[in-house]
Structures are given as C-alpha cells and as structure tokens.
Amino acid sequence: MKLGDQTAPTNDTHLKYLARYGVRNICGYPEIEGDRLYATVDELKRMMDMAAKYSISIDCLDPPILASSHIDHEKHPAIMLAQSPERDRDIEQLQTYIRNCAQAGIPCIKYNMSILGVLRTGRVQGRGDAMYHQWKLSEAHPDTPLTKAGVVNADAFWERITYFLDRIIPVANEYKIRMACHPQDPGVPPEGYQGVNRVLGTIDGLKRFITIRESPYHGLNFCQGTISEDLEDPGTQIFDVIRYFGTRKKIFNVHFRNIRGHRNDFIEVYPDEGDVDFVKAIKVYREVGYPYMLMPDHVPLAQADPDSLQSFAFCYGYIRALIQSISEES
C-alpha cells in the first residue's frame, strides 16, 4: 500500500508541499488546453515529468467530467442527464482519455456517477478550532426543489450507469486502465432526495454495480468514509465490506476517511478520532492484498488553515505511520 493524495493543482508549488510530507503517489490533474475533456499524451507526460522531479508518481487521474459536483453546477452534465448525442460525444472523449493514459503509463482513472454531489447540512465544532462537516437527514429540507435532472428513479439511474459502462469498460479492458467509481455521498432514503434515487448510496447498490460489465478494470474508488456513512454501525460493519470488495479485487483506490455517527446522521472527523478503528482497517486492506493508494479525502476546516494544508499534512503523517507499522509487522 502507498500513501496517496488527490489534492490539486499538480504544479511545482503543490508537488513540493506533497514531497515535504512523504507523499510519493498521487492522483494528478494535467493542464488541458482548450475545451477538450481529455489530456493529450504530451500533456500527461509533462505533468508526469514535473512530478518525477520530486520523486512523485502519477498513479491515477481525475477527469474534467463525472465529478462529485451537483448537476446544476456541472459544466458537462450530459452523461448523467442521459442527453444524446451530447453524452455520446463526452463518452468518446473519455475513451480517448483512456487510450492516452495507457500510452503515457497512467494506470487508473477515478470518477463519480452523481447527480446531487456531496450532501451536507452544516458544520459542527470539532477539537481546537476545527469545524467538521455534518449530514443529518432530519435537518435536511424535504421540500428542496428538483435539480435540472428532474425525477430520476432507480430504474432510470441504473439505465444511465449501464449505458456508460457498456461503452467505457470495453475500452478500459483493451487498454488495461482501471476505472474507479466513487460511491454516492451520502446515501439517501429509498424514496430519494431532490427527486433522485441514489442507487450507489447503499452497499447492495455497489455490489450490483461491480457486476455490470464484469471486468478486472471495472471497480471502485473505495471511499471508506462514504461507505461508512451508508452503515448503521460502521465501527463493526466496515471491515466485512472491505473484505467483500477487496477479495474480489474491486478496490482500485481508497479514500481513507473517518466519521462519527451512522447512516443519515454523521460528522466527518480526523482519522484518529472516528468510529472506525483505522489500525484494524488497514490490516484488513493488507489481508485482502490491496496494493494501491490510501489517501485523505475530506478534512476538517480551520480559520487559520484556509487551504486545509495543515489538516492534510496531519492525515499524511497518520496514514504514512500506519503503513509503516504494518510493513514492519510483516
């Protein structure tokens, strides 16, 4: 396992910061000229060469489409809105990105299939002057208006997912690029929220997802925080979920994030103070043979740390120490 990171931008200043804290593997963000939704091979290699100056490897990419943003603010919403022919053009550009990643030597692309983005109801006081993000379904507004997607029931959402996978996974297979999908954060009740049924917001939904277009290159950006949010008792249940997807080799990247609480009522906290025992969790990743990155995800906020650089640095050190400790054990 490797300490990873997904923060942007991928430039000299930020790469120096990452190298300072021992981060050697990252998700990269190449500079893309024009309106393309993919980087050229030359653009990818320029980014990789820049990172290599700091002994950092680009292990994954985050494309400029299929982000975790709310659909009403998404620049390229066609895939999730099922808008043809626009979605076909966007899918073709992502297919090109897969081919270019293979040529450049970048093995993984992570993405979201989200309409509502990341849902939170507010912030609560944490330790010191830190503020923690919270989701409390009882405080969410049931009369929130529909998004531009309108009503999207489970059948419609699965159709959009399947349409996408039918066209992307064969290309990923051909070029041996792992496609890592993030769960929907957080899950919502079966009747949906803002008219949307979040089918990838349950463990059963994720189990179904990995069976569509079964492939060693079709799997998950396994956000342990989000998946913990889907459980009634994450402190005891998360380990078997890691085993389920890990033994099937469907975990391509890990967002190593902790929470306090449970489904429909939780706060995001530092990794050392949540309900999930991270020492036990990392041993389960080792048990299932997980070989890729463990990276921070959302971190607490503080007025004196507006870019969250201190919070991320704390997480880097914590994760790096865990990796070292289990390496010494073995």
Where are these regions (language model features)?
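Alpha-helix initiation/capping motif
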Residues: 11-14, 40, 136-138, 153, ...
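Ligand-binding pocket scaffold of soluble enzyme catalytic domains
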Residues: 1-37, 42-45, 49-55, 61-63, ...
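Surface-exposed cleft-lining segments at the edges of enzyme active sites
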Residues: 145-160, 186-198, 267-268
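Histidine-acidic metal/acid-base catalytic patches
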Residues: 2-4, 9, 15-19, 49-52, ...
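Short, well-ordered beta-to-alpha junction loops that form the rim of enzyme active sites
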Residues: 111-116, 183-185, 298-299
